[in-house]
Each structure stands twice: as structure tokens, then as C-alpha cells.
Amino acid sequence: MYVVKRDGRQETVHFDKITARLKKLSYGLSSDHCDPVLVAQKVCAGVYKGVTTSQLDELAAETAAAMTCNHPDYASLAARIAVSNLHKNTKKSFSETIKDMFYHVNDRSGLKSPLIADDVFEIIMQNAARLDSEIIYDRDFEYDYFGFKTLERSYLLKVQGTVVERPQHMLMRVAVGIHKDDIDSVIQTYHLMSQRWFTHASPTLFNAGTPRPQLSSCFLVCMKDDSIEGIYETLKECAVISKSAGGIGVSVHNIRATGSYIRGTNGTSNGIVPMLRVFNDTARYVDQGGGKRKGAFAVYLEPWHADVYEFLELRKNHGKEEHRARDLFYALWLPDLFMERVQNNGQWSLFCPNEAPGLADCWGAEFETLYTKYEREGKAKKVVQAQQLWYEILTSQVETGTPYMLFKDSCNRKSNQQNLGTIKSSNLCTEIIEYTSPTETAVCNLASIALPRFVREKGVPLDSHPPKLAGSLDSKNRYFDFEKLAEVTATVTVNLNKIIDVNYYPVETAKTSNMRHRPIGIGVQGLADAFILLGMPFDSPEAQQLNKDIFETIYYHALKASTELAARLGPYETYAGSPVSKGILQPDMWNVIPSDRWDWAVLRDMISKNGVRNSLLVAPMPTASTSQILGNNECFEPYTSNIYSRRVLSGEFVVVNKHLLHDLTDMGLWTPTLKNKLINENGSIVNVAEIPDDLKAIYRTVWEIKQRTVVDMAADRGCYIDQSQSLNIHMDKPNFAKLTSLHFYTWKKGLKTGMYYLRSRAAADAIKFTVDTAMLKEKPSVAEGDKEVEEEDNETKLAQMVCSLTNPEECLACGS
């Protein structure tokens, strides 16, 4: 049996060589729990004649990763093998790697196809010695296996299909792409990112330093005009943006409804559904940046639009295909008046925007005046019971998890862009609230701060601090470093502001908007991990206080950095007349007095003198991919489970929450039997008798935390979020009562985004093939009442809904 080495030579397979390589990579890992010889044995069992050493490394990494549920150190070993393999296949020198990418020639066409921009290449060549010497390749070994594989699959640049970048090369490329010839800032950004304090968003990591550096994540498009020309111009804009890896939110409030008269052709309109099917096919066809991600459009509609019922059906799994557009995402832009009519069981009038114009262009009292005027004039196409439309909204949410719920009046009332005009939609992920018009496509550049990194061990200086902490057992010896958070927030603000200037804009309307208003979006990841490291249950008073303190710090120091930029560069173009220009900050709009942790009086004084460089600053986004890269839980969400399965080339295996695994291993409680119990309980430890109660509280999953608390925490940080937040709602078995009371709770709390996705769990358990049932003791029988899951008929659902509206407190107490 032979292997093929990287230089093409053949060599007999030596078990000892494989073992020696794995032992070398096991430095610092627990020899009691992590056995490289066992991994080597499993690898040898999978060897075949002619296997390459690179493939052997891949198999070894997957084998070690599959053993992670035995001990956390196997995850570290898996990552080290994978990273070491990449290092063997790539050049060490950053500048040499950049040279290879710059002089890249397409092997099919024979044409020069540089992967690096000319100016970035020149800067790197001029500063090659300094940049090369700053890179610390050992930091690549700090990624966990799945984080590294995510980078390798989608983020590291490839030549002829082969990855040529190392993670550290990518981070330096991104830093140079943002800061260009400001080498001191390049190096500062590189070190902060490579030490995992924060990360820029996926499009920035994909494209920084390349010939077309499209670094923005979010685009908000307004339908240009209610005409064939306007619709197709908007469609083209969406396609061009999607090509460049941007997610899109598009508002369609102004498109005339079904049956509306078309003067130009003396015909009648087909409404929004056939149009949205065309947008649906465009989203499918144009993926984000050459197959990286499928195009994604969220469509926003106000509930007074006469096609709203058809709109709510578009994502459902049943029904006629010509009435469905399942690849789009749907969102409602809800005025307060609609919520009041539902609450009071009033009537609701549906209009065609062609016959009742202007409703999308106003909010608050002005909207109510115009809406009731049209009602009195008899312009409604249809009048329905508001609760009946609400019922259809809930039906769609229970079936599909959408539409998203955003409150139009809160979004406008609490926006620093309200001086520009009425804001008509959010973005794909519901955290960006920006003004759009036919001539302005709103854009946002994002970055997220990795909160677990700021949990520090007392008395340990920063330069000798471990890069990653795990588990809650040492929480008494830890604290949260707000000073470092302040410093990193300032750097992130400066970076995102620079991106506005160096960015490649796929459409001119996007450049116009971004240059005028200069909004940015700073988010977080790993809030749940930070709570665990500090030994705080997610819903504890301590966690709720830390949640406020973190976001107060981020908002304060983002504003401070922005006003310092304005002192040098001037305020953004449309600053005059904005709430901030009048001294009104986000906490003022929520009637909240900030703590005295930071000196707000001094900040207000600075702003009154200098203005601010950016109209908007804070927007906690979902961080789906980047949190996986850094090994953190998503954004500000609780853990959804303590155990989940991963599929890789060699099969499927179980992964356990690294903090829980760390704690249980240190306590000597982790056994194959306990693992089986955890799988059988769907990742919950609440019913596992061996685990102490204090750990059960810390590791409660989102299904065991009251959603009311999740909403309270969203509102607590809301007064420091000048955009919005991607707030998912998790409900085990959603019914109309729980959903209604929850939506009304988010509305009354003043949230801008009431709900991103509704996440629910199936009532029936899937068969767990990975559970060794012999290890499980007999479970107590389920209560008879739970066995008979009856179909609730429509009358029952309506009764529940009405009950929750009339008795909101009682209904919320029942556990939504």
C-alpha cells in the first residue's frame, strides 16, 4: 500500500509516520483524553492504494472531528491537522501569495485574470517586508475545525480551483483592501481580526483587495415606479446587486393591486403576485458571486395593500404553483393603526396604491389622517375585519416561519434618517433601517464584535492571555473587559467608515445613497458564549444587565469615533436636520437615561461641535457564517441546542456545545451514557438527573427560556441600537394565542423589528438512529393529554387569538 506525496513521489504507508505527525500536532492537549494513536488507527483503516498525503490529512482531520464528543481536545486536533495540511499546500510568504494571485492567468482562455486589484498589489509590494513580518501563522491553529472548513470552502481565494491563501493571508488582504497605504491602520486591523476580537462581514472577507471590492452586505431597494419600465429597472438593479453578493430588501407598496385600471393600455393589472414570480426566478438565477450563495430578496408590503392576502400565501407549500414564489422572503411593514384595529377588533380597509396614493410615503399621525380620509371617501377596494387578516398572517407564520414583522412607525420615529423622508423597508435580515427612494438604494457595510473574547481572566495580562476560554466552571475568576470593547468598537467604526469610500458599488443609486448618508452597521456575536463564560444563565438579572452595558458601550464609542471622524473630515452630507444634529440620540427616543459608565455629557458636547460622520451606527445582524468561522454562537441569540449533527464527506457525526462538554469533562461526568441521554433529549439537559442544577440553568436552550425575556432583552438593548436587530422568535408549539400576545408585546415594547423568523419545532420527534437505547433507562410515560394532539379548528384558533388580545397578561404568563 503506498501514498502519493505532495511532490508526486510514491511512498509506502507507515503507521508510525502518521502517528508521529498526529502526536506532533497534539502539543498542549490532554494526553489522558485525546489519543492521537487512536486517530491514526482509524485513519489507517481508511487508507487505499494511491491516496495522497493531502487526502490522508483530510481523513485524519474528519476522524478527529468525529471524536469531538469524546473530548473537546479532539476538535483542536482536527483543526490543527486541517490547517497544517493547508500550510503544506500553500506558500508561507504573504507577498509571494499575492503575486501569484495578481499574475493569475485563466487556464482556459489564456487571458490574465488578476484576483488582486492593481493599487492593492502595488501597496503590498512596496511594503512587502513589513507586512510579511507582521503575520503570525500560528494564529491559524486557533480556528476550530468547522470554522476553518467554512473559510476554506468559501472565503480563501482559489487559483484554478485550488486554495492558495491561508487564513492569515486573507485577513491581511482584507486589512490592506480597507486601509490601502495607511500601513499602521492595516497592521492594527490585521492583529485585531487575527486575534479574533472582531470580524468584517462575509462580502468584505470575500472581496476586499480584489479588482471589484464589493464589501457591502445589505442593499435596500425601492420600487422605481409602478410601470413596466420601473419594475424591470428595479429587477435589473436587484440582479446586478445579487451578482455582487448583496442581500436585498425591496419594498413593493406602490405597485397597483389586482384588477386596477391601467390607463396606458386600457387594461387591468395582474397585481403583485406575477411580478414577484419574476423576481423569484431572478433570485434563483443570479447567485451571490459565482455560486457562493443563492440570491436572496426580502419583499416588504404594508397590510393596507389590496393584494395582501395573496402575498401571505406566496411561500406556502400547498396551492397552485402559479400563485407561489417560494424562493423569496416576505415581510410586513406594519403601521400602528393596523395593530390598533386588530386590538380593538375594528375593520380594516384594503386599498390600491394607484387609487389611494401616498400611504407608503407617510407615517404616524400623517398616515392615519390620509388612511381615514381614503376610508371616508370610499376608496377601499375591500373592507375586512382586521382580526381576520391577522388570522391569515398567523396562519402563514405557523406554516412557513414568515412573514417577518416590522413596525413602520417605530422604524421611522426612532430613526436618525427621519429627516430624509419616510423609510419604506428594512433589508433581507431585518436589522437595517434606512431611507430609500427611486434615486437612492440604501447600503450597509457590516462588522461584528466577538464578545466572548472580551471575557478575561483576572490578573492575566492581555499579551499572555489564552486566545480562547471555555466552560463556566472558572467564571468567578473572570470579568468582562469594557475598556477593550470601547477600543475595538472605535476601530471597527473607523474601518466601516473607510469601506464606504473604497467600496465598489454595483449600481450608481447605491453609491449616491452611501456617500450622502454614510450609515454603518456594528453587530455582535457570541453573547450567549460570553454569558456562559461568566457563569450567567441567559435570562438571569446579571445577564440582562451585562446585555445593556455591552450595547451602551458599543453605541457610545461608535458615536464617539464617528464624531472624532467628523472633526477631521466633516459630518455626513445630510446631517443638518437629523435628530442627532438637534441633540437627540437613540436613548432619548426611547425615553431611557443611560448609566454613568461613560460620560454622555462630554459626548453630546463633542457632537454639537463636530457633528457625526455616519448617520447610523449599530445594527446587530444574524452573523450566520462569520460566527461559525470564529466558533461563537450566533449574534445575541441563546443556544438552540446543546447537541447537533454535522455532515462531512466521511459521514455524519455529533457535536456537543463546547462549553458544556468542557464543564462536564472537568467534573468527570461526561460518559457515552450521558451523551446518549443528551441526544435523546434533543440537546436539552433539563431532564438529565446527573447534571447539577446550576449547570442546567446556565445551559438552558432557547426553547426553555421565556420568549418574553428574550423580547425584554431586545428592548433593553434597543435604546442603544440606532438601526434594528435580527430578532428571531422561538416557539416550541406555536398557537394563535401565544403568537398574538407575543407580537403585541414586541409592538408595545417599542421594538422596530418585532420578529425576524418564527422558529418552531415539530410536535413529533424524529427517529434518533444515533441513540444507543440500551444505555437509556426506561422513561416515564408521557401524560395522556399530550398523546392526543388534536387538530385545532379555525374557531378555536380565533378564540385563542381574541383571548390573548383581551387578556394579554394572562396569555403571556402561559409561556410565550
UniProtKB/Swiss-Prot annotation:
Mutation effect (G718E): In cls8-1; crinckled phenotype
Residues holding GDP: S202, S217, N427, E431, T623, A624, S625, T626
Deletion phenotype: Lethal when homozygous. RNAi-mediated knockdown causes severe developmental defects in seedlings failing to develop beyond the four-leaf stage.
EC number(s) per entry: 1.17.4.1
ATP-cone domain sequence ranges: 1-92
Function statement: Provides the precursors necessary for DNA synthesis. Catalyzes the biosynthesis of deoxyribonucleotides from the corresponding ribonucleotides. R1 contains the binding sites for both substrates and allosteric effectors and carries out the actual reduction of the ribonucleotide. Ribonucleotide reductase (RNR) complex function is essential for efficient organellar DNA degradation in pollen. Involved in chloroplast division.
Note: Two distinct regulatory sites have been defined: one controls substrate specificity and the other regulates the overall catalytic activity. A substrate-binding catalytic site, located on R1, is formed only in the presence of the second subunit R2.
PANTHER family linked: RIBONUCLEOSIDE-DIPHOSPHATE REDUCTASE LARGE CHAIN, RIBONUCLEOSIDE-DIPHOSPHATE REDUCTASE LARGE SUBUNIT
Family affiliation: Belongs to the ribonucleoside diphosphate reductase large chain family.
Protein name per its UniProtKB record: Ribonucleoside-diphosphate reductase large subunit
Gene, per the UniProt record: RNR1
